[in-house]
């Protein structure tokens, strides 16, 4: 597994926070990207943002509900870190709503959320949400009620998803271990059991720095990828999915059949959650527009948007520390004029594309329930395909 150090191994379950980066990322393999990345090329390049993970991996063989195999986890994104009590302006959008992101009704109505933003598997949304409510009540705000933002993608191809292995303490640990700096990628956090374009999926991140009128603004993206059909996949414009259409396909190893594992999931069905952060001063309606650009980044990867895919996006701004002002009838906030947003939109598109590509590069082959195995995207063949289509850049 790339980009991850495990600080603890408990009863076969791997628990980790946001760890230092190790191993290659997409740029290291010569994948070309437009735009200037931040220092870590991660969502944490937006000052104050912290990311934490808990990755749960245990058991092997036949699926036994409640026992495993377990291939799942939790991801936490804290817009202003663990210590801040200040909400962030935010907006959300979807390009295909076959999924869930809690808290969006209230987010849409008031234009901000309290944080943290959590991502897990489809059937663990409730327990993670409840854990966050408890954390907010105990640690952050003495408020009357909370509506946390918790999103999901489906990991039932590899994970005992109906065994409910994600517990409140896992969500809390993801929050408590969240950190700034380099961010782990691949088979980590909520992304442990995911697939993407028929290869191993998971978690990825990227960022862009935009210069405007003598000022620098950063846009960071974190994705949990579980979407796309193999023939669609394009990397830097090269038809990687077509070139590898019959190779490295998911398979069942052992006595079980694929039918015993896929639970009727149609090809292309899956999901992607995209979290965007920026320090550019933007209001909720502008952040909703920013969130929409995730679909453009997905399109650069060749995605067409399948019927059963839950493609849900949220964007927030760390500017304007007086979002929730107490006292007074008027507050003053800063915002960028709409005619200055195009470069921010472009940065979000670029960072989304690179974050997804980083997932495919970082994620390792993983075997889960009933011996079902999802192969990693082979690095050498990716480079060969990029070279064939004259898209290979010098490795970073």
Swiss-Prot record:
GO terms for molecular function: aminopeptidase activity. Optimum pH is 10. InterPro entries: ArgJ-like_dom_sf (IPR016117), Peptidase_S58_DmpA (IPR005321). Autoproteolytic processing to generate the alpha and beta subunit is required for self-activation and is proposed to use a similar mechanism as substrate cleavage. Pfam families: Peptidase_S58 (PF03576). Coiled coil: none annotated. Keywords: Aminopeptidase, Hydrolase, Periplasm, Protease, Signal. It catalyses: Cleaves N-terminal beta-homoamino acids from peptides composed of 2 to 6 amino acids. CDD domains: DmpA. GO terms for biological process: proteolysis. The keyword Ribonucleoprotein does not apply. Inhibited by AEBSF (4-(2-aminoethyl)benzenesulfonyl fluoride, Pefabloc SC). The active site is at residues 271, 309, 311. Residues 1-21 form the signal peptide. Its EC number is 3.4.11.25. It is found in: Periplasm. One of its GO terms (cellular component) is periplasmic space. The keyword Signal applies. Heterooctamer of 4 heterodimers ((alpha:beta)4); each heterodimer is composed of an alpha subunit and a beta subunit processed from the same precursor. Beta-aminopeptidase that can cleave synthetic beta-peptides which consist of backbone-elongated beta-amino acid residues that are not processed by common proteolytic enzymes. Can cleave the beta-peptides beta-homoVal-beta-homoAla-beta-homoLeu and beta-homoAla-beta-homoLeu. Belongs to the peptidase S58 family. S.microcystinivorans can degrade microcystin, a cyclic, toxic heptapeptide that contains beta-peptidic substructures. This is Beta-peptidyl aminopeptidase BapA.
